[in-house]
Amino acid sequence: MMNSFVVDNSVVMSWCFNDEANKYGDAVLGRLAESTAIVPPIWPLEVVNVLLVAERRNRLKQVDSVRFITLLSQLPIVVEHEGPERQMKDLLSLGRANNLSSYDAAYLDLAMRNDCPIATLDKKLIEAAENVDVTILKF
């Protein structure tokens, strides 16, 4: 995908919580004015899980979660869907080779297949991306 990048949930959720806001996350958000972010099918579930946990811990009110989901729906973030058979085989192999969770492997696999950079704050994912020659989105 031309002018696209993969964004992982560590970056996306930094947009939700004031105490997690950072310059990198803000720069990635700004980049969406001119680019499209792509995410794996697991991404919406990850977002919702973080919001539910935050609500239960009184970090967020329900209205804040709804507001954040509304914001995300207005951004050029595309969920890429793919058949599970290829995905399971490739993610298992990629996760093993790079000591990643299946979730992180899904983001890395997406960047590899689309030949695009990845935006992440996750140190293990950054290291794995560098190991397989995936560019880290930098500013």
Q: In which residue ranges do the predicted regions lie?
A:
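Short, well-structured N-terminal submotif of metal-dependent ribonuclease cores
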Residues: 1-42, 54, 58-66, 132
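Acidic, PIN/NYN-like endoribonuclease modules and their adjacent C-terminal/linker elements
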Residues: 2-4, 108-139
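Alpha-helix capping/helix-boundary segments
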Residues: 11-12, 43, 86, 107, ...
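Phosphate- and divalent-cation-binding pockets in alpha/beta enzyme and binding domains
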Residues: 24, 46, 90, 127-128
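Active-site-proximal, substrate-binding regions of enzyme catalytic domains
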Residues: 48-78, 88-90
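Active-site neighborhoods of divalent-metal-dependent phosphate/nucleic-acid chemistry enzymes
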Residues: 77-117, 121
